[in-house]
Amino acid sequence: MARAKFERTKPHVNVGTIGHVDHGKTTLTAAITMTLAAQGKAQARKYDEIDAAPEEKARGITINTAHVEYETEKRHYAHVDCPGHADYVKNMITGAAQMDGAILVVAATDGAMPQTKEHILLARQVGVPSIVVFLNKVDMVDDEELLELVELELRELLNEYEFPGDEVPIIRGSGLKALEAMTANPKTLRGENEWVDKIYELMDAVDNYIPTPERDVDKPFLMAVEDVFSITGRGTVATGRIERGRIKLNETVELVGLRETRTTTVTGIEMFKKSLEEGIAGDNAGLLLRGLKKEDVERGMVIAKPGSITPHTKFEGEVYVLTEKEGGRKTPFFAGYRPQFYVRTTDVTGTITSFTSDDGSAAEMVMPGDRIKMTVELIQPIAIEQGMRFAIREGGRTIGAGVVSKIIE
């Protein structure tokens, strides 16, 4: 078992394929698994296995997502691929499958298409940090100038959405040709087939260009309060799941949201009725807070490293509005609509002041099934930050899912 243990030391990165329908995302995903399986670094997955993506629920929304995993010399990857366009929209907005980087698949025969643009825009809005491009189906294009033109257009498009279009690696290849080569001889290694080599070239780009994300435990401490108790003779305990960072005894923290920010000291950390010296990301813990009464703390506040997060009331969000079939509204809504925004552990009422379409023009109303950018004003300040996910609820049921794309005030 020594081998398995050794591999756990590789950094883990979450990636996904994005791009226009029928440009070859799933074929490429299958080709990557089969190519790396020849080195024993992946389980080979056929196209049909990936395409028949199981349904999952994220924030009450059903999404079809396929997950595959593989590794390179440098890293371990979890890779997500979605069968339908709506699944991508929902996946990226809910953050159901977090992406530290994306592989944008573009067919050389078509160039950039509407969903290519939409996926780049979404990646920008939801905070996908890096994109690597795979120019697919190049075996079907004889004209070198045409390929260069498509690349140029893609770089301009990436720049337009604030990705460094001039630096983004663009790898030319053919997912299908690589898949055919690997199917004919599953033991094909690097240097034995030109199309398989393109898959290795792509993985090199992913390895080297997509930065290793900072681990949750290394980020500034944050825990959203779920419940508050009073323990006679000891004080007030707030419970919740530590979202990121670590907390040690006697560290100073801030209580942020709903009221004036307050500073306090953590005098006890408990988990499963046992005292701990330290709590880390992922732990469900109870924190004993010095000098606070039970009524000073409420669900929806966050306990965080001082200065790391601030309360806000106005933000812009990229939102997917559920269809009636998904349990959402039957009717459209307009600016001035006042639903609840469920953030981390609590609902806060807010007014949607305006809607913006992808082209920057104002939209009058929003229909179930739409994706839209909206400006929201909450009635109480809460701890929010760019990239944070939220749900929109009406009478306790979810009618939309969103991500904060910009803080206004």
UniProtKB/Swiss-Prot annotation:
Cysteine disulfide partners in this protein: none
Top-level taxon: Bacteria
Chain positions covered by the region annotation G5: 174-176
Enzyme class: hydrolase
Transmembrane found in the keyword field: no
Main location group: cytoplasm
Catalytic reaction(s) noted: GTP + H2O = GDP + phosphate + H(+)
Annotated positions binding Mg(2+): T26
Region (G4): 136-139
UniProt-annotated location(s): Cytoplasm
Region (G2): 60-64
Keyword set, alphabetical order: Cytoplasm, Elongation factor, GTP-binding, Hydrolase, Magnesium, Metal-binding, Nucleotide-binding, Protein biosynthesis
UniProt-recorded Gene Ontology molecular function terms: GTP binding; GTPase activity; translation elongation factor activity
Keyword Protein biosynthesis on entry: yes
EC number from the UniProt entry: 3.6.5.3
One GO location term (cellular component): cytosol
Annotated positions binding GTP: 19-26, 81-85, 136-139
Ranges where the record places region G3: 81-84
Positions of region (G1): 19-26
Start and end residues of each tr-type G domain: 10-214
Subunit structure: Monomer.
HAMAP family the UniProt entry points to: EF_Tu_B
Homology family: Belongs to the TRAFAC class translation factor GTPase superfamily. Classic translation factor GTPase family. EF-Tu/EF-1A subfamily.
Function: GTP hydrolase that promotes the GTP-dependent binding of aminoacyl-tRNA to the A-site of ribosomes during protein biosynthesis.
PANTHER family xrefs: ELONGATION FACTOR TU, MITOCHONDRIAL, ELONGATION FACTOR TU-RELATED
Protein name per Swiss-Prot or TrEMBL: Elongation factor Tu
Organism: Thermosynechococcus vestitus (strain NIES-2133 / IAM M-273 / BP-1)
